[in-house]
Amino acid sequence: MSVFESETSNFHVYNNHEIQTQPQMQTFLSEEEPVGRQNSILSLTLDEIQMKSGKSFGAMNMDEFLANLWTTVEENDNEGGGAHNDGEKPAVLPRQGSLSLPVPLCKKTVDEVWLEIQNGVQQHPPSSNSGQNSAENIRRQQTLGEITLEDFLVKAGVVQEPLKTTMRMSSSDFGYNPEFGVGLHCQNQNNYGDNRSVYSENRPFYSVLGESSSCMTGNGRSNQYLTGLDAFRIKKRIIDGPPEILMERRQRRMIKNRESAARSRARRQAYTVELELELNNLTEENTKLKEIVEENEKKRRQEIISRSKQVTKEKSGDKLRKIRRMASAGW
């Protein structure tokens, strides 16, 4: 059997001519658990972490817990620094600065958070119909010291739950349909059709670290780890939703912006019309007041002229009386 495995890829490619059965492939999956994943700080229980750090996490709040946790992570990296190969990268735990803790969660202690998790499990108990649900129920009934750090952070809401990809193999290509794997037809450099089954391991994929894997037949193999701005975009895309929903939200936002702009223009236009009407009213009132002032001025002038004429008549009459001849003596 030929296995093409990328150094950091999450996919294994199997030859079509030597397809294993489903139990054999499941056994291979359990045996091929990454060494970095087993030795990762995420796979340790809280009791093991407390033994390494020498501190009790129960009475700590979540901020202190993460701060002490990073000290343990650095010590674990120093101890097992040479154990990891260059091609194997364990599950990456985000730095404390990149973890967004809600304000109520920062003030709570680890024991209080665990009590809320247990209360949530009791309020929503899993059904015991399938074996997977039964195993999950047993795992949820663990104590605080027995639970792994990864499960605790996921249940507490500090880290998003790992994305597990399960792909089914095409029955038309291989004649059977196992629980995992997908039929992939890729053509090599010699232009010969080569059907290979590709299955994805259930490795953790946190939103802080984006990972993309690609399969190339022949002599070329390509894989890439996305960090920085690409990881932030992937995290934002996961939080916001698929592109269709984002496009619909963008269109609704554009429609709302246009409606808001139209309402603003209508308000400005109505305000302008109101100002123009008020200006016209003030202009008409000013014209009427000017006419009234002119009429009053004319009346005042006419009164002044009539009074001046009357005064001149009175003065002329007084002069005639003074010039009248006086009566002479009788002798």
UniProtKB/Swiss-Prot annotation:
<protein>
    <recommendedName>
        <fullName>ABSCISIC ACID-INSENSITIVE 5-like protein 1</fullName>
    </recommendedName>
</protein>
<comment type="function">
    <text>Could participate in abscisic acid-regulated gene expression during seed development.</text>
</comment>
<dbReference type="GO" id="GO:0005634">
    <property type="term" value="C:nucleus"/>
</dbReference>
<feature type="region of interest" description="Basic motif">
    <location>
        <begin position="249"/>
        <end position="268"/>
    </location>
</feature>
<dbReference type="InterPro" id="IPR043452">
    <property type="entry name" value="BZIP46-like"/>
</dbReference>
<dbReference type="GO" id="GO:0009738">
    <property type="term" value="P:abscisic acid-activated signaling pathway"/>
</dbReference>
<comment type="subunit">
    <text>DNA-binding heterodimer with AREB3/DPBF3 or EEL/DPBF4. Interacts with the AFP proteins AFP1, AFP2 and AFP3.</text>
</comment>
<keyword id="KW-0804">Transcription</keyword>
<keyword id="KW-0805">Transcription regulation</keyword>
<feature type="domain" description="bZIP">
    <location>
        <begin position="247"/>
        <end position="310"/>
    </location>
</feature>
<keyword id="KW-0938">Abscisic acid signaling pathway</keyword>
<feature type="region of interest" description="Disordered">
    <location>
        <begin position="296"/>
        <end position="331"/>
    </location>
</feature>
<feature type="modified residue" description="Phosphothreonine">
    <location>
        <position position="143"/>
    </location>
</feature>
<dbReference type="GO" id="GO:0000976">
    <property type="term" value="F:transcription cis-regulatory region binding"/>
</dbReference>
<dbReference type="GO" id="GO:0045893">
    <property type="term" value="P:positive regulation of DNA-templated transcription"/>
</dbReference>
<feature type="modified residue" description="Phosphoserine">
    <location>
        <position position="40"/>
    </location>
</feature>
<dbReference type="InterPro" id="IPR004827">
    <property type="entry name" value="bZIP"/>
</dbReference>
<feature type="modified residue" description="Phosphoserine">
    <location>
        <position position="98"/>
    </location>
</feature>
<keyword id="KW-0597">Phosphoprotein</keyword>
<dbReference type="Pfam" id="PF00170">
    <property type="entry name" value="bZIP_1"/>
</dbReference>
<feature type="compositionally biased region" description="Basic and acidic residues">
    <location>
        <begin position="296"/>
        <end position="320"/>
    </location>
</feature>
<dbReference type="InterPro" id="IPR046347">
    <property type="entry name" value="bZIP_sf"/>
</dbReference>
<keyword id="KW-0010">Activator</keyword>
<comment type="similarity">
    <text>Belongs to the bZIP family. ABI5 subfamily.</text>
</comment>
<feature type="region of interest" description="Leucine-zipper">
    <location>
        <begin position="275"/>
        <end position="289"/>
    </location>
</feature>
<keyword id="KW-0539">Nucleus</keyword>
<dbReference type="GO" id="GO:0003700">
    <property type="term" value="F:DNA-binding transcription factor activity"/>
</dbReference>
<keyword id="KW-0238">DNA-binding</keyword>
